[in-house]
């Protein structure tokens, strides 16, 4: 196997990167009918596996779970989750030969082994589904020619996929058909029915490609979604302690600050997030964000370049082969940081507005990271819609995991692939922020309110225009229109 993307010529690469079409709701008029009466077997019962399966069953589809014999015999967590929810559970040999659609929802690093084990068992003309295309794009997995290969990728953690479905809604979803494996021309119909069964069609579906999904997903999770939050958490906490702030207060401000700040981002984009600040603080946050963008622009571009070339996947897979030595070392180092071990601050009260007023630097980091990730993806040929979902849209969901159990929880919830990329970014970004940005801070940038200053009306007007006219704000306003029923995401409700 080799990197599939690197086997394509330049025209094909650009075509695949640029695949992005927002689908009309009318295209889902048949909803799940194409898969009604067909046998669907899900491999793996983690967060995505279980919650997608629950939604699909509630949508009237026939769902069963195929697990490894040892998982069944030892009654591991995956077996317990599936059986306790009333699903048929069996081995690969028992369930896959009769399946019309086999959905591989195991972790990325298990995909090659899983596909090798199940492909001989998949019946002629059946379909194989993924929710992330790393195995196809980066590892170059070749699937038997009679098998249709599709992807349905909800742009949320599995728990949110279920919660939104229970509310009668759904989460934005990306679908794709592998161009090398659509022998009967049924791939799009399968993907549409699967997306509808999870509820995704109610929140907006992008028809994309395996390539565009993988390259944009890796970029988002490595930079703004995880890497920037990790680097920002560590640097901001250390600065607060250096300034003599109470460790419990500092820990709480950072732990819950990202969630509170990005809730505004979720509802009204960068514009609303910045509008939560006083005029003096907004001008300062804008200035800081421009400084951060200048210092980190090269790093965002390096990550994008390494993702496009396949260098990131090559290095990560070397670590897989080495027993995850780097991943485990970085995970251990994160667990020993001052922020992770700060007091919980359970008796400290911080109002919603105080998170903004005392977190101007954090707001600036969010703005800079979102815009850099979006701009870098678009410059690379990824469409604005995909870039939006892989940067701004998912950020509140990741921030919510930090609010639950700090960086530990974030790194548990995200995939090992995302966690590895997060460390690669944060390990470089944090020292840069500490050296280049922290020494330039002024009173009111972090840990206390920005002092009121005389406001230059023309400057404020120009800053407001710059915020509102950024391309991510324009596409974001359009896409959020499809998500009018979005609920608040908060660990503190």
UniProtKB/Swiss-Prot annotation:
For this protein, the record's SUPFAM superfamilies field holds: 6-phosphogluconate dehydrogenase C-terminal domain-like, NAD(P)-binding Rossmann-fold domains
Q: Where does NADP(+) bind?
A: 45-48, 68, 76, 78, 108-110, 158
Co-factor binding details: Binds 2 magnesium ions per subunit.
Name the cofactor(s): Mg(2+)
Q: What positions does the domain KARI C-terminal knotted occupy?
A: 209-345, 346-486
Instruction: Please tell me which top-level EC class this enzyme sits in.
Output: oxidoreductase
Q: What Enzyme Commission number does this protein have?
A: 1.1.1.86
Instruction: Provide the binding site for Mg(2+) 2.
Output: 217, 390, 394
Provide the GO biological process annotations.
isoleucine biosynthetic process; L-valine biosynthetic process
Cellular component, GO annotation: cytosol
Membership in a protein family: Belongs to the ketol-acid reductoisomerase family.
Query: What HAMAP family does its record include?
Result: IlvC
Q: What does this protein do?
A: Involved in the biosynthesis of branched-chain amino acids (BCAA). Catalyzes an alkyl-migration followed by a ketol-acid reduction of (S)-2-acetolactate (S2AL) to yield (R)-2,3-dihydroxy-isovalerate. In the isomerase reaction, S2AL is rearranged via a Mg-dependent methyl migration to produce 3-hydroxy-3-methyl-2-ketobutyrate (HMKB). In the reductase reaction, this 2-ketoacid undergoes a metal-dependent reduction by NADPH to yield (R)-2,3-dihydroxy-isovalerate.
Its recorded name reads Ketol-acid reductoisomerase (NADP(+))
- Provide the species name: Histophilus somni (strain 2336)
Gene name per UniProt:
ilvC
């Amino acid at each position: 196997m080799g990197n599939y993307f690197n086997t394509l010529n330049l025209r094909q690469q650009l075509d695949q990167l640029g695949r992005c079409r927002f689908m009309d709701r009318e295209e889902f008029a048949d909803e799940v009918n194409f898969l009604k009466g067909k046998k669907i077997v899900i491999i793996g019962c983690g967060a995505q596996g279980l919650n997608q399966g629950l939604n699909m069953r509630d949508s009237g589809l026939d769902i069963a779970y195929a697990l490894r014999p040892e998982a069944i015999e030892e009654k591991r967590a995956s077996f317990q989750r599936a059986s306790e929810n009333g699903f048929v559970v069996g081995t690969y040999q028992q369930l896959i030969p009769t399946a019309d659609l086999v959905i591989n929802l195991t972790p990325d690093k298990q995909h090659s082994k899983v596909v090798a084990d199940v492909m001989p068992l998949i019946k002629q003309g059946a379909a194989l589904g993924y929710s992330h295309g790393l195995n196809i794009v980066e590892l170059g997995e070749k699937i038997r020619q009679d098998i249709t290969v599709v992807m349905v990728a909800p742009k949320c953690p599995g728990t949110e996929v279920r919660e939104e479905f229970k509310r009668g809604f759904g989460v934005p979803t990306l679908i794709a058909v592998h161009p090398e494996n659509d022998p009967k021309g049924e791939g799009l119909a399968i993907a549409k029915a699967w997306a509808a069964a999870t509820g995704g069609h109610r929140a907006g579906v992008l028809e994309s490609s395996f390539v565009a999904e993988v390259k944009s997903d890796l970029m988002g999770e490595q930079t703004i979604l995880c890497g920037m939050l990790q680097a920002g958490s560590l640097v901001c906490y250390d600065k607060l302690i250096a300034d003599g702030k109470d460790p419990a207060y500092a820990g709480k401000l950072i732990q819950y600050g990202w969630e509170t700040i990005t809730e505004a981002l979720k509802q009204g984009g960068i514009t609303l997030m910045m509008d939560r600040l006083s005029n003096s603080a907004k001008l300062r946050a804008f200035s800081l964000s421009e400084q951060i963008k200048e210092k980190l622009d090269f790093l965002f571009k390096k990550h994008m370049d390494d993702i496009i070339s396949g260098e990131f996947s090559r290095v990560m897979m070397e670590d897989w082969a080495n027993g995850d030595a780097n991943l485990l070392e970085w995970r251990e180092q994160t667990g020993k940081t001052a922020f992770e071990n700060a007091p919980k601050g359970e008796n400290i009260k911080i109002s919603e507005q105080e998170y903004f007023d005392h977190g101007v630097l954090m707001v600036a980091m969010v703005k800079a990271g979102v815009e850099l990730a979006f701009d870098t993806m678009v410059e690379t040929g990824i469409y604005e819609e995909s870039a939006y979902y892989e940067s701004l849209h998912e950020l509140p969901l990741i921030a919510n995991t930090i609010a639950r159990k700090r960086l530990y929880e974030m790194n548990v919830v995200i995939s090992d692939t995302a966690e590895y990329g997060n460390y690669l970014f944060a390990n470089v970004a944090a020292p840069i922020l500490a050296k280049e940005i922290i020494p330039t801070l002024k009173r009111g940038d972090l840990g206390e309110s920005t002092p009121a200053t005389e406001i230059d009306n023309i400057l404020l007007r120009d800053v407001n225009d710059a915020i509102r006219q950024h391309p991510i704000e324009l596409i974001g306003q359009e896409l959020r229109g499809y998500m009018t029923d979005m609920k608040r995401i908060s660990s503190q409700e």
